[in-house]
Amino acid sequence: MISSYCFSLVGRDHIKNHIPCHDSSLIKAISSSWKIAVVADGVGSCKHAEIASEIAVNEVAELIKKQFPPSSSDERAYFSVIHAAMHGAANAIEVYVEENDPGNEMQYQTTLAVAIMSSKCLYYGSAGDSGIIALDDQGNYHLVTKKQNDDLGRVYSIPTNRLFEIGRANYIPVAVLCMTDGIYDTIAPVTLQNNKFPVNVPFANMFVTYALGLEKFKEPEAVESCKNSLIKYLQSDECKHMTDDMSVAALINTNSDLQPEDIKWEEPQIDFYALKWNEVSLYPSIETRNKLFKEFIREKNPEWTERQIDELLEKYSKTDASSSATDDMKKLTPDSDTKSNQDEKRNASSMPEVQLELDKEMMGKNTRGIRGFWKKRS
C-alpha cells in the first residue's frame, strides 16, 4: 500500500504582509499500484502566483492519470506522458490568462514538481526550484532533482520557461517527498551539499517513518496524526527561521521491509568558516573580504586575540589562492572529456537529451486536442 498526504501552509512572511499562500499541493491515485504527488510554488513577485500554482498541480495530475500506461516495458512511454503533462500544465496557465487576463502572463508564474510512485518504481518531473527527495530500500536518501535558477538566483518558472527535468530513479523507492523551497531548503540545505549525507535525515524522517511497516487498518488515523504533528511543528518557534510558504506531498510504501533504524545517517562535519569564506569571496575587493571574514571570526570567538584571528584568515585566504591557481591550470589543459566519458557522467535515470520520438509523436498529434480539453476545463 502507498500511504500519502499533502498540505500547504502560508509562510510567516506572507502572514505578516497579509499575502495569500502561493503554494499548492495534491495527491492523486492512478490505480491501486500507482500514486501521484505534486507541489507547485507560485513565484512571489507575481500578482496571481496562487492561481498559477493551483492550475499547475491540478492539470499535471489529471493529465498524467489520463494518459499513464497501466504497464509498459518501455520507460520512454512514461517519460513522454510526464513531459506532455508538464507542457499541459504550462499551456493551461496560458489558456487561463488568455481568457481572463490577456497580456499578463508574467503575473502567472510557478514552479512544479511531480512524482509518480509504485512499490517498485519512481518517475519524476520538475521545473523551477521546488525539489524532490526519495528514500530507497537500503535506507539512503537521494536528492532526485536539481533546483533550476539562473546566475542571479532567479527561478526558471512555467509557463515562460519549460526546462523540464524528467527521469526515473535507478533504485527501489520506499518514499518520495515533493516539496516547495520553503521546506526543501531546510531538508536539503546548502550547508550539506558536499556532505556524505546531503539530506537533513532526522528532519526528513519526520515526514516518512510513521508509515514504515504500517498496517492497512491503522493507515488513515496514522496519516492524520502525522500530518497534524508536522503542521504543528512547522508552525512552532522551532521553525521560526522558515518564513516562506511551505508545501509537501508525500508517498510512502507501507509494505517495505525498511525500518526507521535502518535509515543511514551520520552527524555532519560542517566547516562554517569555509562556507563564510566562500560567501565573502564574491566581493572583488580583498580588503572587503578580509574585513567581513574577520568580523565573522570575532563574532564567533569574542575571546580570541587579533593574532589568532589573523592566523585563521591567512589559512582560508591561502586555500582560496591555491584553488584559484588550480582552476587557472585547468583552463590551460586541453579538455580530455571524450563523448564516452560524458555519456558515463550523465545521470542514468534522466530523460535522454534528444527528445524521444515517441514524445514528438504524442505532442505533434495531440497538442490541438489536448489544448481544447484544457479550454473546456477552464
List where the protein language model places each region.
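Short hydrophobic beta-strand that contains or immediately precedes a catalytic carboxylate
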Residues: 37-40, 125, 177-179
